[in-house]
Amino acid sequence: MVWLSEFAGCFILLAGGYAYMCNISLKKTQIAALNYTELTIAWSLAVGFGLAVSSIMGGPAYLNPGVVLGNVICNGMGIGEAALYLLMEFLAAGAAMLVCMIFFWDSFRASTDAPKRGIFSAYPVEKNLPLNFIQELIATFFFMFIVFMCITGVSDLKAGNQSLIIGMVGFGAVAFLSLSFNSTGYSMHA
């Protein structure tokens, strides 16, 4: 169930985020224009619900290669276990992409001249790879620090309450970082 929870949480996170990106990037959609506040809320909700779903299903809700790598380095997670988490995350990314491609098929076909690069990937505002890497490290540090500090003691709560708090912390951390340490287009801690 742990592997399924990682897949499900990551799928919810990415499908929600990708769908919003499709809405603002493609023609013939309901939103059709970038609004930074909406973008922040959409990605924050996607992360919050992804974390909550994964947690409810009994998983640790890593949902991110950066978090898995951090557990390998800091917590002694084995390479084999890490590889399975990464596999679930990459499979979830592919499934979320496929669902969005199907859901927005007509919009993709109508958007021959629209920029599609940012739907399924992120890129920095200013391309400076060494600095961008450092920016990602800083954003990842803030994300992990906030999450770990805020969920201390959560294990003492009932399972449903744990999942709700974990989801809310994820929502809040992403919203905060999106409006502050975000120079690489929501790829922070990815």
Enumerate the predicted regions with their spans.
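Membrane-interface helix-loop junctions and terminal tails of multi-pass membrane proteins
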Residues: 1-190
